[in-house]
């Protein structure tokens, strides 16, 4: 099962949006996209960045934001036989894994930075994703990451 959400990050004088897709099996970030607009297209780009066959995915969970609950995402999920799961309205606890991942992402990698471009944010996000993935694997195999 996969979970996802969007968050915003200050870039220059604007807000940029980050969409992360997390594998619930091991909490690995397996998909991501960044952009200036909070849209279904941003979610689609994150889905397309997943490095393995979507036919292996059984469930896709998100909140009820219009960028997730729409025809474009419905068509993608249906094409791969993926079951949709939506949080109850007004209940962030239903998407707790995504919420806690974003909290850690912002505390560890965003709040101490000042981003001037989307490219800077993309580089930092990719480094954060690599670190988190490496850290998870290190914890599973009991050694520390050497980055």
Regions found by a protein language model. Give the residues of each.
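Charged DNA-binding/catalytic regions of mobile-element recombinases
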Residues: 1-147
């Amino acid at each position: 099962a996969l979970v996802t959400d969007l968050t915003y990050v200050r870039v220059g004088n604007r807000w940029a949006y980050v969409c992360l897709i997390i594998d619930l099996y091991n909490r690995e970030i397996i998909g991501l996209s960044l952009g200036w607009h909070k849209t279904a297209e941003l979610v689609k780009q994150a889905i397309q960045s997943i490095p393995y066959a979507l036919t292996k995915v059984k469930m896709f969970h998100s909140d009820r934001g219009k960028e997730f609950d729409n025809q474009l995402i419905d068509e993608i999920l249906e094409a791969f036989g993926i079951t949709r799961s939506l949080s109850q309205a007004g209940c962030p606890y239903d998407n707790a894994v995504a919420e806690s991942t974003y909290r850690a992402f912002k505390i560890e990698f965003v709040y101490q930075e000042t981003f001037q471009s989307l490219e800077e944010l993309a580089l930092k996000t990719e480094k954060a994703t690599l670190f988190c993935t490496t850290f998870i694997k290190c914890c599973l195999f009991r050694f520390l990451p050497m980055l």
